[in-house]
Swiss-Prot record:
Numbered residues of crosslink Glycyl lysine isopeptide (Lys-Gly) (interchain with G-Cter in SUMO2): 123
UniProt record, GO biological process: positive regulation of transcription by RNA polymerase II
Pfam families xref list: Rad60-SLD (PF11976)
InterPro entries in UniProt: NFATC2-Int_DNA_Repair, Rad60/SUMO-like_dom, Ubiquitin-like_dom, Ubiquitin-like_domsf
Record CDD domains: Ubl_SLD1_NFATC2ip, Ubl_SLD2_NFATC2ip
UniProt modified residues of type Phosphothreonine: 311, 313
Role according to the record: In T-helper 2 (Th2) cells, regulates the magnitude of NFAT-driven transcription of a specific subset of cytokine genes, including IL3, IL4, IL5 and IL13, but not IL2. Recruits PRMT1 to the IL4 promoter; this leads to enhancement of histone H4 'Arg-3'-methylation and facilitates subsequent histone acetylation at the IL4 locus, thus promotes robust cytokine expression. Down-regulates formation of poly-SUMO chains by UBE2I/UBC9.
Entries under SMART domains matching the protein: UBQ (SM00213)
PROSITE patterns linked to this entry: UBIQUITIN_2 (PS50053)
Biased composition (Basic residues): 7-33
Name listed for the protein in its UniProt record: NFATC2-interacting protein
Amino acid sequence: MAEPLRRRGPRSRGGRASRGARRARAARGRCPRAPRSPTRLIPDTVLVDLVSDSDEEVLEVVADPGEVPVARLPAPAAPEQDSDSDSEGAAEGPAGAPRTLVRRRRRLLDPGEAPVVPVYSGKVQSSLNLIPDNSSLLKLCPSEPEDEADLTDSGSPPSEDALPPGSPWKKKLRKKHEKEEKKMEEFPDQDISPLPQPSSRNKSRKHTEALQKLREVNKRLQDLRSCLSPKQHQSPALQNTDDEVVLVEGSVLPQNPRLFTLKIRCRADLVRLPVKTSEPLQNVVDHMASHLGVSPNRILLLFGETELSPTATPRTLKLGVADIIDCVVLASSSEDTETSQELRLRVQGKEKHQMLEISLSPDSPLKVLMSHYEEAMGLSGHKLSFFFDGTKLSGKELPTDLGLESGDLIEVWG
């Protein structure tokens, strides 16, 4: 903004004594004042703020002169030592000449007159070697993306003849050729030609080779793992005998067969005997014979209506904990009846467990069989009825009269 000129009015006049004292003090410390000049004609200064990119300063811009009355300016005091440029410019005139108030302002420049200042230094600008805008170089640039990919893969700069004489690329190509010639002179036997790029076939071959190596490593690791396994190794003779696998049917017996409690019912008693599943029933027969005080030949074991062989085992018979075996004690026979003609007849009661096998001579009446059954089953005094093939027996019949044979069944109802 322009600063308006200040007009100084006349000082207030005091008494004579004070004015004389002030003049005396001014005479001692100041230089003699310049004589006051009458009203002068000075040009009207136009105050303008100027903006410039340079460091030059212009004192003032003078417009059309006009007469402006200026008030009387007092003579300035002795110039003091100041670093300001305004004070130095004001003190340069002669002591007797009147001083003019000078105000420095910046010059407003036209945009076309603004000086061009480089942004980069000379060193930075020399390193920026840009490709010049030349039509010969533009012809070398491919227009299709496939050609661009081929050009980037090759990575070779344009030829030296296609470049303009002042191009930096030409200097670089010349230096590169000189280096290659030096290398050829130093190592004449060494082949410094660029290596050919691997084709897709070579890449696939390398891929298959890598897969083969991985398979070999996996196979070796598996072999090593089998060698370190805690399993027992068989001899090579046993391993290479036959490649066939033979399946053997049937259950394999465990090393330690388990024990279970076998229930044996004899008359009104129930005997619990711990036996092994692989143990034959002959041990049960011997135990029951010693328990009853009879000969083992007189002990008969029955499971339902089936006579059990002494050589059978609980595993083969599939006996469980809930199954019950009946033990029958056969009656003792006389010497004349111990012949090969004796009949072994089965007598079955109303209940399933009331079954007894009795040996009887063909000449003996059936009354003997009935009384023997009543004693063995503890049913003495009970009214029982015996039937053979639906015919009720009175006890007076003989086996030969009825045509009985060994293994025939006589039913008992009571």
